[in-house]
Amino acid sequence: MKGENDMENLRNSTWMCCLSKVHDSLLMWAYYNNHKGICIGLNKEAVLNSCQYKFFGLMFPFAAEVKYKDILQKPDYFKDHLSWNDLLLTKAKAWEHEQEVRIITKDPAWVHAGRNIPDEFKKEDIVDWKEIRHYVPLSSDCFESIFLGVNMLPRNRTKIIDIANKLNPNIKIYQMTLDPEAFRLKGELVNI
C-alpha cells in the first residue's frame, strides 16, 4: 500500500538520536552493559547548534520528548492525518522510566556527517557499524559530563577520563556508586 511505503520511506529518511534525561536509573544502567559503560551528559542546545550547521536537509534538527502510550495507534492511511512527529515520538508506556528525548532530522545532507571515527578511537573496537552508518561530529562544548559505571574496568576508566579531558577540559566526570542506604545510584565528582 502507498501509505505503508510512505511510512517506511519516512523511517528510512529520518535520522534520530535517542537520549535520556536521567543518568542514575538502575534499570538503564543494568540494560546497557550491566553498569560497565558510561553515560554522556550533553548540552542539548549546543548539540542542536552543532548539528544545524552541518546539515542542509529539508529541516533543521530538533529535540523533542517522547510520549508514552498504552495503546498503539495504527494510522488509517486514508483517513488519519497523524503528523510524522507523532509516529517518531511515541513509545510504549512500559519505557516511561527512560524519560527519552530524541533529536531528529528529516532528509539530512549526510555528506556532512562523519564516516571515519576520530583518531583516538581507531584502535578501539567500540563502534558497531551495523547500527551506525554515519555520525554527526559534535563540537567539544556539547559534552558537559561523563558518568562512569559502577562496574567499569579500571583500565577503561582511565582511558575514558583521558579522552574526556582531551575532548573538553571543562567536562565534569562522575563515578557512579551504589547508595548504601537506598536502592539508587549516586554520582560522585572525580577529582582529576
Model-derived segments and their meaning:
Residues M1-I192:
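Catalytic-core loop-and-flanking beta/alpha module that positions acidic residues
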